[in-house]
UniProtKB/Swiss-Prot annotation:
Record's subunit section: Homooligomerizes. Interacts with PriB. Component of the replication restart primosome. Primosome assembly occurs via a 'hand-off' mechanism. PriA binds to replication forks, subsequently PriB then DnaT bind; DnaT then displaces ssDNA to generate the helicase loading substrate.
Organism: Escherichia coli O127:H6 (strain E2348/69 / EPEC)
GO cellular component, as recorded: primosome complex
Keywords: DNA replication, DNA-binding, Primosome
Protein task: Involved in the restart of stalled replication forks, which reloads the replicative helicase on sites other than the origin of replication. Can function in multiple replication restart pathways. Displaces ssDNA from a PriB-ssDNA complex. Probably forms a spiral filament on ssDNA.
NCBIfam families, per database record: PRK02854.1 (NF002770)
Keyword DNA-binding: yes
Protein's name in the database: Replication restart protein DnaT
GO biological process, one term: DNA replication, synthesis of primer
C-alpha cells in the first residue's frame, strides 16, 4: 500500500517512545512522521505547531469578508429548452446535443475531456444528413459520442500530420546497433 509522508522528519516508534521530547525538539517545523513496521503510523506534533495549525484552521473557517452577496445574483434564469422532435427523426442542419452531453456520454461509457467542437458537430451532421437514417434524439447523441471517441482516438490524440511535408529521417542510432 502506498502512502504519502507530509514531513521530511521521520522517526521509528521506538525512538519516539524512548525520548519524545528530544525527537520533537529536533523536528523541522514541529512535526515528525512516526513509522511502525516500516509504514507511517501517525504524526507527532509539538504544542506550538499544533496551536499554529488550529489558529490557521480557525482563520480559514471564518469568511474572508463581511460583505454578503445578494442571492438574486446567483439565480440565473433557466435557459429555455431546445425543442427536440418527438420520436425518430432524420438528422437536420440545426440539430444540437443536450447541454449535459458530456455527462450523458460518460454514463454511456464514453469519456470526453472536451466538449464537441463546431467542426466535429458539422462533420457529424453532414455525414448523417446524407445517410438519411432516422433515430431518436438520445440515439443521435450516443452516435455522436461514439463518433467523437473514435475520431479523437484515431491518431492517439495528436493533431493530423500535414501530408505535404517531407519527412526527415532520424539520424540517431538506437542502443545495441552499430552505426
Amino acid at each position: 500500500m502506498s502512502s504519502r509522508v507530509l514531513t521530511p522528519d521521520v522517526v521509528g516508534i521506538d525512538a519516539l517512545i524512548h525520548d519524545h521530547q528530544t525527537v520533537l525538539a529536533k523536528a523541522e517545523g514541529g512535526v515528525v512522521a512516526v513509522f511502525a513496521n516500516n509504514a507511517p503510523a501517525f504524526y507527532a506534533v509539538t504544542p506550538a505547531r499544533l496551536a499554529e495549525l488550529l489558529a490557521l484552521e480557525e482563520k480559514l473557517a471564518r469568511p474572508g469578508s463581511d460583505v454578503a452577496l445578494d442571492d438574486q445574483l446567483y439565480q440565473e434564469p433557466q435557459a429555455a429548452p431546445v425543442a427536440v422532435p418527438m420520436g425518430k427523426f432524420a438528422m437536420y442542419p440545426d440539430w444540437q446535443p443536450d447541454t449535459d452531453f458530456i455527462r450523458q456520454a460518460a454514463l454511456w461509457g464514453v469519456a470526453l475531456r472536451e466538449p464537441v467542437t463546431a467542426e466535429e458537430l458539422a462533420s457529424f451532421i453532414a455525414y448523417w444528413q446524407a445517410e438519411g437514417k432516422v433515430f431518436h434524439h438520445v440515439q443521435w447523441q450516443q452516435k455522436l459520442a461514439r463518433s467523437l471517441q473514435i475520431g479523437r482516438a484515431s491518431n492517439g490524440g495528436l493533431p493530423k500530420r500535414d501530408v505535404n511535408t517531407v519527412s526527415e529521417p532520424d539520424s540517431q542510432i538506437p542502443p545495441g546497433f552499430r552505426g
